[in-house]
Amino acid sequence: MSGIKALKIGDLVLQRPVIQGGMGVGISLHKLAGAVAASGGMGLISTAQIGFREPDFKTNFVEANLRAIRREMQKAREIAPKGTIGFNIMVATKHYDLWVKVAIKSGADAIVSGAGLPVRLPEYAQAAYEEMKAGVADAKENCEEFCKQAVKKVKLAPIVSSAKSAQVICRLWDRKYKQVPDFVVVEGPLAGGHLGFSREELAEYGADTKDVPNTYNQEAYDKEVRSIMEVVKTYEEKYQKHIPVVTAGGIYTHEDVKHQFELGAEG
């Protein structure tokens, strides 16, 4: 599709405004993420059971996953040295804080986090920066330049499904951490994975039937997306910072993509 604008997230620029979704347990790994990043989008590696191929996964799954996070990022970088590569990390998983910290230390450009609201994501990111800086300082007497590299700020994005959840996460990050998301991912009721909708809400949108193309109420969820954007706009104005909104779910065709851009989505 001609005329598509690049997606700008702070100092990151995606020439293709596409963020590949996180699909766990062996789908969103280095090959897929690297290929997307090499094509100008953002490739995401899923940390969900990422170390399942490690020989000690069943007996030492924490270390197995940590090794796999580092390795998958390294391999993705080999595919797309200058590409934008991040991680999809589910809040609901055990040791969430460890996955966040090692993802940052491995050189992630972004972390997208859902399956629950990532209320402590900024805290864990800051802990990673401090650990990195301390490690570099220990290794180098004159660490000024190295420390600057060590604390490269990773772009943080919550996944939300409603204006209410967007308001909750933005307000909490604002009050507790004096920061806001770098971008926001909106997962609609037609998205795959761990959705933030009750059965009643899915029924309300007509997304719980065997004939979704004919029952889905696009207009109703479009209204919710606009409300989410209004919430984000409030915090953009407060922080004088652009916060792109990226939509996901039920986007299959050229017309679907065009519709999302017309709503105000940037990816």
Q: Over which residues does each language-model region extend?
A:
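Short, catalytically relevant binding-site loops at active-site mouths
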Residues: A191, I251-H254
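Glycine-rich beta-strand-to-loop/alpha-helix junction loops that act as flexible
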Residues: I243-Y252
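A compact, surface-exposed functional segment
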Residues: V257-G267
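Active-site entrance/lid segments in N-terminal catalytic domains of soluble metabolic enzymes
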Residues: M1-Y239
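A general structural signal for well-ordered alpha-helical packing
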Residues: V225, H254-V257
